Design a protein with these regions (language model features):
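Conserved acidic segment of CheY-like receiver
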Residues: 1-9
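Conserved phosphotransfer microenvironments
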Residues: 49-65
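Acidic, metal-coordinating helix/loop segments flanking the phosphotransfer/catalytic sites
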Residues: 30-46
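Alpha4 helix (beta4-alpha4-beta5 surface) of REC/receiver domains from two-component response regulators
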Residues: 83-98
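A short, hydrophobic beta-strand element within the central beta-sheet of small alpha/beta folds
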Residues: 73-83
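Short hydrophobic/Thr-rich beta-strand motif most characteristic of the beta2 strand and flanking loop
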Residues: 23-30
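C-terminal output helix
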Residues: 104-112
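Conserved phosphotransfer cores of two-component systems
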Residues: 42, 66-72
Length: 117
């Protein structure tokens, strides 16, 4: 299972199409608060985070993820446009397992999701 925090419908649609092909359930939410609720309830294998999601506090999300027990802590991948260097750095500093540019995410999303199935 995957939780995807994004308000970008194109990214969500692309990820959903790949997840469907792989037979993986994906839940898209538009806030970190809702994302954390779903993570705690459903214990996904992967959390995808659009670091450019409006209102997202990257540091607070990282702190919330760090508090999770290892048994429910998902692999966390954040992404943002390559010019958003502060957001990319914030994702790294927040302890995300991987931080990608939006272009990398677009080209690798199928492989990333296949790794969950």
């Amino acid at each position: 299972m995957i939780v995807f925090i994004t308000s970008d419908l194109m990214m969500a649609s692309n990820a959903s199409a790949h997840a469907k092909q792989q037979g993986v359930k994906i839940t898209q939410v538009s806030s970190a608060e809702r994302g954390m609720e779903v993570v705690k309830e459903d214990r996904p294998h992967l959390l995808l985070v659009d670091l450019q999601c409006p209102g997202l506090d990257i540091e607070a999300l990282g702190a919330s993820l760090a508090k999770l027990a290892d048994s429910i802590s998902p692999l966390t991948i954040g992404f943002a446009q390559h010019v958003e260097t502060e957001k990319l750095s914030a994702g790294r500093n927040a302890g995300f397992d991987q931080v990608l540019t939006r272009g990398q995410m677009n080209s690798q999303v199928g492989q990333i999701i296949a790794g969950v199935s």
